[in-house]
Each structure stands twice: as C-alpha cells, then as structure tokens.
UniProtKB/Swiss-Prot annotation:
EC number: 1.2.1.59
Protein known as: Glyceraldehyde-3-phosphate dehydrogenase
Residues bound to NAD(+): 11-12, 111, 169, 301
NCBIfam families, per the entry: GAPDH-II_archae, PRK04207.1
Any one GO molecular-function label of the UniProt entry: NADP binding
Pfam families: Gp_dh_C
Oligomer status and interactors: Homotetramer.
Main location: cytoplasm
Pathway connected to this protein: Carbohydrate degradation; glycolysis; pyruvate from D-glyceraldehyde 3-phosphate: step 1/5
Source taxonomy: Archaea, Methanobacteriati, Methanobacteriota, Methanomada group, Methanobacteria
Length: 337
C-alpha cells in the first residue's frame, strides 16, 4: 500500500483524494491547505489528516476550529508520491524548490507547462511511457477529453488532420469571482494551447484548436473535425467509442441532448459530487462526409482528469506495468462506466 499525499485540497485535489482512497493499492496519508475554509473543514470531517502549507497560519486554523496534523513539509516526509493540485505555475515551482530537493515523486496538473515537468500523461495513450517516471503532468481536462476520443480514431483509421473548436465553460460552479455572466469571450490566440498539448501525448498528430468562453459552469463542449487516413464508417467510429475506456456515447433521443441533462444523469448514477468522469459523445453528431469525421463531445472539467491521476500513480510507482489493467482497476473502484 503506497502512501500518497495531496498538495492543494481544492477542486481537483479533493476528488483525487477520494479516488485514491477508493483503491486497494494506495492510501491518502494527508492533504494540504493554505487557508481555513470549508474545504479544509470538510477534509478533516471526512477523516483526512490536514497539513498546512503556510505554518504561520496555524492560529487561523485553530480559531476556525479546524484540527491541523502538521506542516506540508512534515507530510512530504511520509510519502511515496505527492499529487500537486496547486494553481498553475506553483506546481513547477514546488518541483524545483521542494520535491527535487527531497527526492519525492510528484504528479502535476494541466496548468503546468509540459517543458517544466518533462513528461505528460494520458492513461489510454501513453501509460507505458511514464512507468517509473519521477515527475509527470496529467494533461488538462480539455486535452484529456481530446486524447480519449482521438486515440481510438487514430488506432482504427489514422489521422491526417484534426480541427477542433473548444467551447469552454466560463467558471466552475463554486467560483463566484469569474465570468463571463452575459458574454461570449473568444480566445484570440490561435492555436489555443489544447492542440499543442495533445501533441505532448500523441506526438505525430496534426491538430489545430480554437477556443471561446461561454456563460455556463457545467461542462465544456468540443466540436471536432477529423480528416481520416483510411476509409471507415460511422458505425466503425461508434464501435470504437463504445469500446474505448472512459468514453460514453450518449443519445439526444434519450433526453441527453445537453450538458445540463448529462450532469443530471451523473447525479442519477449516484456519482460523488455529481461527477462525470467519462467523455460523453453525442451519437447523433457522429458523421463522415468525404473522408472527414465530425462529432461533438462534452467534458466535465472538474472530474475527467481524476482517474488519470490514479493511473499515473500506478505507472510512476510501478504498481502495474499494463496500462489497461490499471485503467480497469481504477474504473471498477470508482464506478466508471
């Protein structure tokens, strides 16, 4: 049983903590917080030992009635690996200032640059490449979504070119300080970072992405166009999606024609926090015209990367050499379809 810690018990960190706790070959030793907020309080109430990353704030936690087990540095000494879920840029700094100095393996999230970490991870696409690695970056929610559906297409047909438009949610549901509220905000930088990010996983894929923000909090959606190498049918694509791990073909005809209905479905499945770990692909959107594949998918930005973190732990700590076995083990423990 390997000892795992979470540095940054926020939107992703708290979900990874629960996912690790559901496994039988790893355990959560502790989690860290900077401020005494409801997430810190909930962590203690759930039974996680809470460590503070700013020791000078211990009195603030005491005043809030939140029990502290020690400092982040004390937690790190107890771990086989830390999952760093701190805001983008801080993780890379922690890698240099802390983890490398004490010889602690670490996983980082998609807010970090690939070059700063050295290796990027997607369980289906490059698990084997990350076996035994010391520092690995789990790519962002959007990049994870693209990799999950492009990889099976790549395998059955080959891909000449991908063009994708990312319709991104404006903020997470709990983030009251961000927007937009009544606006659509284009990301005028082209390509958006998502295309180059996919290439850190599937390096020989030709992919170009554009993105925009819209006033919703539920999910991202992707409109994807793929020029195929070989002639295949829509049934071939749908079969590939059906057989792919963590991809969920859904039907508008079953009243799953919107992100709101998909997230309601996740709640009806009894998912913790109403999470949708899989990438829903609308079956009715899958079409091939003149050798070009079109489809639409959704991405739950708060949770699709969570099982990837679990598989990355197994790869880095060499708990399982077979990526598919790790994926299936994680899926079973988390109730992933």
């Amino acid at each position: 049983m390997k000892s795992i810690g979470i540095n940054g018990y926020g939107t992703i960190g708290k979900r990874v903590a629960d996912a690790v706790s559901a496994q039988d070959d790893m355990k959560i030793v502790g989690v860290t917080k900077r401020t005494p907020d409801y997430e810190a309080k909930a962590a203690v109430e759930k039974g996680y030992d809470l460590y503070i990353s700013v020791p000078e704030r211990e009195s603030q936690f005491e005043e809030a009635g939140i029990e502290v087990a020690g400092t982040a540095d004390e937690l790190f000494e107890k771990l086989d690996l830390v999952v760093d879920c701190t805001p983008g840029g801080i993780g890379a700094q922690n890698k240099t200032d802390i983890y490398e100095k004490i010889g602690l393996k670490a996983i980082f999230e998609g807010g970090e640059d690939h070059d700063a970490i050295g290796s990027s991870f997607n369980a289906e696409a490059n698990y084997a490449d990350n076996i035994g690695e010391d520092y690995v970056r789990v790519v962002s929610c959007n990049t994870t979504g693209l990799c999950r559906t492009l990889k099976p297409i790549y395998d059955i047909s080959g891909i000449k070119k991908v063009r994708a438009v990312m319709v991104r949610r404006g903020a997470d549901p709990s983030d009251v300080k961000k927007g937009p509220i009544n606006s659509i905000v284009p990301t005028t930088e082209v390509p958006s970072h998502h295309g180059p990010d996919v290439q850190t996983i599937i390096d020989d894929i030709n992919v170009m992405t554009m993105a925009l923000l819209v006033p919703t909090t539920l999910m991202h959606t992707h409109n994807i166009m793929v020029e195929l190498e070989d002639k295949i049918t829509t049934d071939d694509v749908l079969d590939a999606f059906e057989n792919a791990h963590r991809v969920l073909p859904v039907q508008k005809s079953l009243k799953l024609g919107s992100t709101a209905e998909i997230m309601e479905y996740a709640k009806d499945l009894g998912r913790s926090r109403g999470d949708m770990y899989e990438i829903p692909v609308w079956k009715e959107s899958v079409n091939i015209e003149n050798g070009e594949l079109f489809y639409m998918q959704a991405v739950h930005q708060e949770s699709d990367v969570v099982p990837e973190n679990v598989d990355a732990i197994r790869a880095m700590l060499e708990l399982e050499e077979d990526g598919e076995k790790s994926i299936l083990k994680t899926n079973k423990a988390m109730g992933i379809l």
